[in-house]
Design a protein with these regions (language model features):
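A short acidic/basic microdomain associated with nuclease active sites
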Residues: 67-96
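Active-site beta-strand-loop-beta-strand hairpin of nuclease catalytic cores
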Residues: 95-116
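Short secondary-structure boundary/capping segments
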Residues: 118-122, 175-183
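Extended hydrophobic secondary-structure segments that form protein cores and membrane-embedded regions
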Residues: 159-166
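A short acidic (Asp/Glu
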Residues: 167-177
């Protein structure tokens, strides 16, 4: 129903449609256009599904440069490298400071609706295993980097793996998180990597919406201080932006709206409309 939110229950096929979940209809005509784009190709024959992923990676990159002060943080994008003659693309991004490193994998894949509605079952297991593929790919890239196979130069500081997703995966129950960890450990074993990586180098899963806020917290606190608190928190996989409120209640961090110039280009009248509504900001 995410793809076809309008249904016709009439056997005589009269032009009468029902919309059981109006929210699905709204999403279908906005972000749901992805379902149409991913099936097509551009004039060069490149599938839009792949381009969609690339566009998301570029967006995450823009957020990194918007959030992190380059006087204190170093930001590195994707840097392909060769291993035994084969090209590997490596991580999608790395953010480093004097205390630690964040290795980033971007994923547009979403949790299927059926998986969101249950805490068990085949649909959920399949979705979690798809996410586990991304997590293990990130661990593989980190393994290459720490062994000197990539362009990144190891600095001896702790590494925190971050999978940044387009949508939230709602990983807020211990049961679901445990299932995800099991999927990751099975795939780590298949990739001949230590299962214990989930304990020695715990991974984060966060949506880009959450990261836009949490990234500002990281920029304020520093990588190691924020992430060390995060690895022992229930917010490591869900609502990462709430972590600071719970772990650092005495810290005052003023969050700002990001990419204001882009918003102004897309919605040139937004500030005027916001003024009419008595709002300080148009977004």
């Amino acid at each position: 129903m995410e793809v076809t939110p309008l249904i016709n229950l009439d056997n005589h096929q009269t032009p009468l449609f029902w919309c059981p979940l109006p929210d699905f209809l709204l999403r279908r005509i906005t972000e749901g256009l992805f379902h149409d784009l991913c099936k097509g190709k551009n004039q060069l024959g490149i599938e839009f599904g792949n381009e969609y992923g690339r566009a998301f990676e570029r967006y995450v990159g823009r957020i990194l440069y918007e959030v992190f002060d380059l006087d204190r943080f170093a930001i590195t994008g994707e840097q392909p490298y060769k291993v035994s003659g084969q090209i590997r693309h490596g991580v999608d991004g790395i953010v480093s400071d004097a205390t630690g490193n964040i290795f980033i994998e971007c994923k547009t894949r979403r949790m299927k609706q059926g998986a969101k509605e249950t805490a068990e079952g085949e649909t959920l297991e399949k979705s979690l295993d798809e996410l586990a593929v991304a997590v293990v790919q990130l661990y593989k890239n980190i393994d290459d980097a720490t062994n000197g196979l990539s362009e990144w130069i190891p600095n001896g500081r702790p590494i925190y793996p971050f999978v940044i997703t387009y949508e939230d995966w709602y990983l807020f129950t211990p049961q679901v998180v445990n299932q995800l960890n099991e999927c990751v450990q099975h795939r780590l074993e298949a990739a001949q990597l230590p299962r214990a990586l989930t304990e020695t180098m715990p991974f984060f899963v966060t949506s880009i919406g959450e990261f836009e806020m949490a990234g500002q917290d990281i920029a304020h606190l520093g990588i190691e201080r924020f992430c060390a608190a995060g690895v022992i928190s229930e917010y490591r996989h869900f609502q990462l932006s709430v972590l600071v409120q719970k772990a650092f209640p005495n810290e005052t961090i003023v969050h700002r709206h990001l990419l204001k110039n882009s918003w102004g280009e897309i919605f040139p009248k937004m500030q005027e409309w916001a003024g009419m509504a008595g709002m300080k900001e148009g977004w």
